[in-house]
Amino acid sequence: MFFNSDNNPIAESVYVFMSIIFPQLKETDIEVIHTDLTEDNVFGWTLINNDQNEIEIHNDLSERDYVTTLIHELVHVKQNVHGVTDDTIREGEAYELENTLADIYLTGNSYRMLKQR
């Protein structure tokens, strides 16, 4: 189940996009919480709370940064499902994929249709 605290349509759309690439995202509960992370000096992070993955994402990002950050954090959720715990591997994969997948998402049909609403 995917829950996004602000009912942000971009978050929903990014989740659908990422679930096509990584179907295992559908196997876990994911909650996206939009919050002020200024003092933490990060755009986002992922926490495991019981069996749920909680993504906290900064509430004042540009659209590009929001999409890139959410994709980065959803890669971490996929890694959690697979039991990947090595931080070097986790961050390496997330950083390697975030911009490429953000570019694909931002130039894709689902994003364009979302923007036409």
Each predicted region: which residue ranges?
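Catalytic zinc-binding patch centered on the HExxH motif and its immediate surroundings
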Residues: E31-E54, R64
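Zn2+-dependent metallopeptidase catalytic core
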Residues: N4-T28
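Acidic/histidine-rich, surface-exposed loop or edge segments in extracytoplasmic proteins
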Residues: M1
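Catalytic glutamate of the conserved HExxH
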Residues: T69, E73-V77, V81
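Hydrophobic (often cysteine-bearing) scaffold residues that line and stabilize catalytic clefts
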Residues: I10, V67, R90
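Short pre-active-site segment immediately N-terminal to the catalytic Zn-binding motif
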Residues: D51-L70, V84-D86
